[in-house]
Amino acid sequence: MKETITTPQMELLIYKYFEKSSLVIVPKFSRLNAVRYDDNTKRLGYRSENIVTHECDILSVTKNNFLREVEIKVSVSDFKADFKKKHNHEGNIKQFYYAVPYYILDKIKDLVPEQAGILVAEYNAELLSEHWQLKRYKKAIDNKSATPIDEEKLNKIFRIGYLKYWFYRKREK
């Protein structure tokens, strides 16, 4: 029997994989999370700047303040549907990865854009505690035009991560 993995399981694997190399890791980060900067040249006295241009399944900030995005795909149809969306995975994202289970890798690996990396969830029944492990199959090519985020954006990402944590904890009751 083939073991399958869920999106929440993938989220935890990604968290564990990038935990030591990240300042913060936030699931389901929306493009609506903008930062306001004081700007007296604007009519309202501020300007608003989006952190990302689309929703990210996982957004992490590296220890050098660069953004890293991971798109989770647990089926081939889910993977192919991503290419029908109107957005791309560029902007100020330094590294972009697809995270997929081992059982769809052969069907999608040739469809992955050149700059995107691939993380693969592998199942090993012989492991005592965690049967699923995430391994890097292909390294992401760094986006050379990406710049480190500033303190305001980093604080906003921390805040969104904090709010999401408590939102989900309250729902567990």
Identify the function of each model-found stretch.
Residues L67, K73-E122:
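Catalytic cores of nucleic-acid endonucleases
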Residues M1-P27, A34, K109-K173:
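Non-catalytic C-terminal interaction segments of nucleic acid-processing enzymes
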Residues I14, S48-E49, L59-S60, K84-H89, ...:
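Short, flexible, glycine/charge-rich loop motifs used to bind or transfer phosphoryl groups or to couple energy/partner
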